[in-house]
Curated annotation (Swiss-Prot):
Protein name: 2-O-methyltransferase NoeI
Top EC group: transferase
Organism of provenance: Sinorhizobium fredii (strain NBRC 101917 / NGR234)
Gene null: resulting phenotype: Disruption of the gene has no effect on nodulation.
EC number of the protein: 2.1.1.-
Gene expressing this chain: noeI
GO molecular function terms attached to this record: O-methyltransferase activity
Cytoplasm as UniProt keyword: yes
């Protein structure tokens, strides 16, 4: 019993030290790959299970595979253009699987609002969302949105149950204002998820988008590990304190 307790305490101290080092490291300017490297160091295993929700062309997933070749990557992307590029970029990677669905709070079909851009950014597909654009239209006037398209959508809990995933090391999420939808459809899954990395905005870029404080309120078992602010927007890394 004593040995087990000391071992558990030692692992906890090790994780806390890594979290402090992570927080200290991000105070300095850092590259995207360095952020990925710091995150996988917190996972402390060679074969983590990672869900990339809103993966676009799969760039982040490929970075994780570069750092952890034995990782299992499950990628979700509802925009047909981005999904096609992701599938092409995947090539023969057998550790990375793509699902062309939107993750939300329901199963079935849902409207997706694809984005485009003006000028050199006419192929811009990084701002599409299942939520209608709102302040995004004035804040980023060079981005435009075409009429909605119907895409397949799944609840995270139902998808994970069918996939047979018993635990998840990291959810990497970029869903353009639909964070609360993912959370609502994934409450059971999140209880067995160790880390969440998500984009946020404290202005309502999309209809009904929640600010960071409200997102954190929906995740009471998660603590804020690190924040990467860009004005009133940014990204955060959260840790499940129950695991």
């Amino acid at each position: 019993m004593e040995v087990g307790r000391y071992l558990k305490e030692g692992l906890l101290i090790s994780l806390q030290q890594r979290l402090r080092e992570f927080a200290e490291g991000i105070r300095k300017p850092t590259s995207s790959l360095k952020v990925h490297r710091q995150i996988v160091s917190l996972l402390e295993k060679p074969d983590p299970v990672i869900l990339d929700i809103g993966c676009n062309d799969g760039s982040d997933a490929r970075r994780f595979l570069q750092l952890r070749p034995k990782a299992q990557l499950f990628c979700f992307e509802p925009d047909p253009r981005a999904a096609a590029r992701c599938r092409e970029n995947m090539g023969p990677l057998d550790r990375m699987r793509l699902f062309e669905v939107a993750i939300s709070d329901r199963n079935g079909r849902i409207d997706f609002h694809p984005s485009n851009g003006d000028g050199d950014a006419k192929e811009w597909d990084l701002s599409g969302s299942i939520r209608q654009p709102k302040n995004h239209l004035s804040e980023y006037q060079w981005v435009r949105f075409d009429g909605p398209i119907s895409v397949e959508t799944r609840r995270l809990d139902d998808w994970c149950s069918e996939a047979g995933l018993e635990s998840i090391d990291l959810i990497w999420m970029d869903v353009q204002g639909a964070e609360s939808d993912v959370i609502a459809g994934g409450k059971e899954t999140l209880t067995k998820t160790r880390f969440i990395y998500t984009e946020y905005s404290d202005q309502e870029l999309y209809e009904g988008q929640l600010p960071l404080r409200a997102i954190l309120d929906l995740l009471p078992s998660f603590e804020l590990v690190a924040q990467f602010p860009r004005g009133v927007e940014g990204d955060v890394l959260l840790r499940n304190t129950k695991l």
